[in-house]
Amino acid sequence: MAIVKATDQSFSAETSEGVVLADFWAPWCGPCKMIAPVLEELDQEMGDKLKIVKIDVDENQETAGKYGVMSIPTLLVLKDGEVVETSVGFKPKEALQELVNKHL
């Protein structure tokens, strides 16, 4: 499954079913740029079980505020629309897999 780019309007629909890893990021954020290829690898390896959604906090401040995003990158694991895990900052692939696997 390809990584989905969400907006304030589409975020709820994109995260309402199954296990979703939501990446709150911004184009100017160095650690966000570092985590992008890690998310691509996760998508290739786990895309059949996991949906990855990216949301630009500069363009979608309403959703970032709703979820209390204060620092980026912030990664939320949602299961059927409910937040079950939160991670702030860059994490290696193995740490993200561990974060997600608990909820698959």
Swiss-Prot record:
**What Gene3D superfamilies has UniProt attached to this entry?**
Glutaredoxin
Disulphides: 29-32
- Gene Ontology annotations of biological process type: cell redox homeostasis
The keyword Glycosyltransferase belongs to this UniProt entry's keyword annotation:
no
The superkingdom of the source organism is: Bacteria
Q: List, alphabetically, the Pfam families matched.
A: Thioredoxin
Q: Which CDD domains match?
A: TRX_family
Similarity-based family:
Belongs to the thioredoxin family.
Q: Which PANTHER family match?
A: GEO12009P1 (PTHR45663:SF11)
Q: Which cellular component terms (GO) are annotated to the entry?
A: cytoplasm; cytosol
Please state the gene responsible for encoding this protein.
trxA
Example GO molecular function: protein-disulfide reductase activity
Q: Does the keyword Amino-acid biosynthesis apply?
A: no
Please identify the protein, giving its name as recorded: Thioredoxin
Q: What does this protein do, in the record's words?
A: Participates in various redox reactions through the reversible oxidation of its active center dithiol to a disulfide and catalyzes dithiol-disulfide exchange reactions.
According to the entry, every stretch annotated as the Thioredoxin domain falls at 2-104
Q: Which UniProt keywords apply?
A: Disulfide bond, Electron transport, Redox-active center, Transport
